[in-house]
Amino acid sequence: ITAIEIAAAKHPDGTPIVPEVCIFFENELMRGNRTTKINAENFNAFRSFNYPPLAKAGIHIRYNEHLIRRPDPSRPMKPHYLFDTNVVVLTLFPGIQESIINSVLHVPGLKAVVLKTFGSGNAPQKEWFIRQLKEASERGIVIVNITQCQSGAVEMGRYETGLQLLQAGV
């Protein structure tokens, strides 16, 4: 019932209190594009690690109005229906082999790689790894660095390994 109340809630001028896509679970309203499913079995199954709840529900619903995005009425909504499927998510792991990286970076038609690195953006320091990323970047493949951690962010210049990625075009 609370999810329906939130979806139907309006300001006095008739505009929705929460005009965005959200997930309501375990008494918290989370921004949809910031939320991850963390558990397949428990009720506390969703979490927004890097963004606070838009609302919390108990006896009353308490909205964090300053966190809720308001649409710009001068710009009509422009949904994106076609997404480029020539993008791969590559999760790094200790001992990853050169042949795996080579295979991924040479997929025909590949346009982008989402590189899931360690901690604040660290990756193997192997010469072949940095070289392959640099060559892929020079071929026009976009490579972005995200952390495997559930919270926090990448800081490419923080450690030498992250700096090497930056110099390779990541």
Where do the protein language model's features map onto the residues?
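Accessory alpha-helical/coil subdomains and C-terminal extensions
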Residues: 22, 28-120, 125
